Amino acid sequence: MLVDMGEQYMLTTILSFLIVTTVVAYVSWLKTKGDDLKSSKGYFLAGRGLSGLVIGCSMVLTSLSTEQLIGVNAVSYKGNFSVIAWTVPTVIPLCFLALYIIGWL
């Protein structure tokens, strides 16, 4: 029986997704199996073991979500680049917030 090339690519895509997801889940489990994830401090702040740079980068990159990658481009194309003024200035306050979270401020 001949398999349609579209079906073959879909099967390859699904299998690749399942393999990569399984590997990421297993490695994540190995790295966090001894961590305190039951308390809010352990879960949200990684037991206060992260630096301000890591927390700040995480907060900035979280704000650059799909909305930023798709929505801002569409609005900029339709109008102008003023919509980017919402994200760019937030980098500095987010860095200060990260320092406050870890207790340096």
UniProtKB/Swiss-Prot annotation:
Its main location: membrane. It is a multi-pass membrane protein. The keyword Membrane applies. The chain crosses the membrane at residues 10-30, 44-64, 83-103. It is found in: Cell membrane. Coiled coil: none annotated. One of its GO terms (cellular component) is plasma membrane. InterPro entries: Na/Glc_symporter_sf, Na/solute_symporter. One of its GO terms (molecular function) is transmembrane transporter activity. Keywords: Cell membrane, Membrane, Transmembrane, Transmembrane helix. Belongs to the sodium:solute symporter (SSF) (TC 2.A.21) family. This is Putative uncharacterized symporter HI_1315. It comes from Haemophilus influenzae (strain ATCC 51907 / DSM 11121 / KW20 / Rd).
